[in-house]
Each structure stands twice: as C-alpha cells, then as structure tokens.
Amino acid sequence: MSGGKGGKVGSAAKASQTRSAKAGLTFPVGRVHRLLRRGNYAQRIGSGAPVYLTAVLEYLAAEILELAGNAARDNKKSRIIPRHLQLAIRNDDELNKLLGNVTIAQGGVLPNIHQNLLPKKSAKPSASQEL
C-alpha cells in the first residue's frame, strides 16, 4: 500500500490552478467568495456566484479605467488622478446613472455654464423689423 493520492510513484503532480485562472480573470475569485460568505448576504453561496460577481467587478473596473485613461490623455497627463475618474464617470450616461450618488474625493465638478449666463448673439436687424 502506498500513502498519498494513489498515483504512480515519481509522477509529476498536476499544478493547482486558481478559480480566477480557470475563468480567465485577473480579480481574485477566492477573495470575493470569502467576502460573500463572511458578509452575511445569504446562508449559502453557490460556486458560480463569486465567479460571475468577480467578472462583473473586473469589467466595471476596466471600463472606468479606460475612460479615465482617455480623460487623462485628453488633458495631456500620463497619470490618472481622481479628477479624471470624475470626468470619465460623469460624462458616461450609464456609469453616471450607476454611480450617481457617489462622491469622488478631489474629483471636482463638471464644467457647465448655464445658457442664461452666456452672452447674447448679436443679430443683424432684418428687413421685416424695419417698418
């Protein structure tokens, strides 16, 4: 009788693969699963739930970072700052709806001048007004 897992002696053991690697994700599936279990959201957590939630979180992070990177490039900066995150989120309709109640520290406000405060366009008098 041999101890262990019953394989051939001296055979290479299969390297373990994380759930993140199996799903092709960068964010940690195991950590999300642990946080779901310890967060008292439900008594039981299915095996697919943390994978799906991790994929959603990774997608949202990638989307926000891409838009913030574009905002940084538009401002001729190479580093993303909170202002770029604010501009990225507030200029995107869906992200603004999702994060409408979120305050970003050091984010500032969107530039906006009310129409009534803009100077009036000077129109040349037309022939119909001269009667």
Curated annotation (Swiss-Prot):
Family annotation (SUPFAM superfamilies): Histone-fold (SSF47113)
Changes after translation: Phosphorylated to form H2AS128ph (gamma-H2A) in response to DNA double-strand breaks (DSBs) generated by exogenous genotoxic agents and by stalled replication forks. Phosphorylation is dependent on the DNA damage checkpoint kinases MEC1/ATR and TEL1/ATM, spreads on either side of a detected DSB site and may mark the surrounding chromatin for recruitment of proteins required for DNA damage signaling and repair. Acetylated by ESA1 to form H2AK4ac and H2AK7ac.
Modified residues (N5-methylglutamine): 106
Compartment list: Nucleus; Chromosome
GO molecular function list: DNA binding; protein heterodimerization activity; structural constituent of chromatin
Principal cellular location given in the protein's record: nucleus
Tagged with keyword Phosphoprotein: yes
Annotated domain remarks: The [ST]-Q motif constitutes a recognition sequence for kinases from the PI3/PI4-kinase family.
Protein purpose: Core component of nucleosome which plays a central role in DNA double strand break (DSB) repair. Nucleosomes wrap and compact DNA into chromatin, limiting DNA accessibility to the cellular machineries which require DNA as a template. Histones thereby play a central role in transcription regulation, DNA repair, DNA replication and chromosomal stability. DNA accessibility is regulated via a complex set of post-translational modifications of histones, also called histone code, and nucleosome remodeling.
Name of the protein in its database record: Histone H2A.2
Organism: Candida glabrata (strain ATCC 2001 / BCRC 20586 / JCM 3761 / NBRC 0622 / NRRL Y-65 / CBS 138)
